[in-house]
Amino acid sequence: HGWGYDMNVACSSATFGIQTGVDAIRNGSARRVLMVNPEICSAHLAWEDRDCHFIFGDVSTAVILERGEDATSDNQWEVLGTRLQTRFSNNIRNNFGFLNRADPSGVGSRDKLFRQEGRKVFKEVCPMVAEQITGHLGDLSVPVEDVRRLWLHQANLNM
């Protein structure tokens, strides 16, 4: 028995899926969650615009989340806390992606494809992420020096 839904927000979809899985375990609706995150972005990318395609593509990630007392793997990570944030920006837009592009009136129209001002997005996101991480660590009473690994983004090797 289980449930699933589609959440296509590219670089954040895995983190939102993990948050949902953690919440399901914490509230007792699940003991174990397999979070599979297929990202199919290539069909709505503007391949002639490097800012819009260089970090995106088709990929899938998966993670098993479970209660600590049920975990048996030698490779375990404890979720100490979760915190998500979204912020609207006109510097990155999907314009309904696949749905909008299927309308015959929009075939070949640039505004029907994903678009981003990559450098502007980078300048918006970096300070927001730094504040998010340091604030969350502070709320968890975890010194920055004690952090050995962060999973921030499933982008390509160029990032």
Which residues are covered by each model-predicted region?
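Acidic, glycine-rich active-site loops and adjacent beta-strand->loop/helix elements
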Residues: 9-14, 37-43, 83-87
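Flexible, glycine-rich active-site loops centered on histidine and acidic residues
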Residues: 24-59
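Phosphate/pyrophosphate-binding loops at sites that engage ATP/ADP/AMP, CoA/4′-phosphopantetheine
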Residues: 131-148
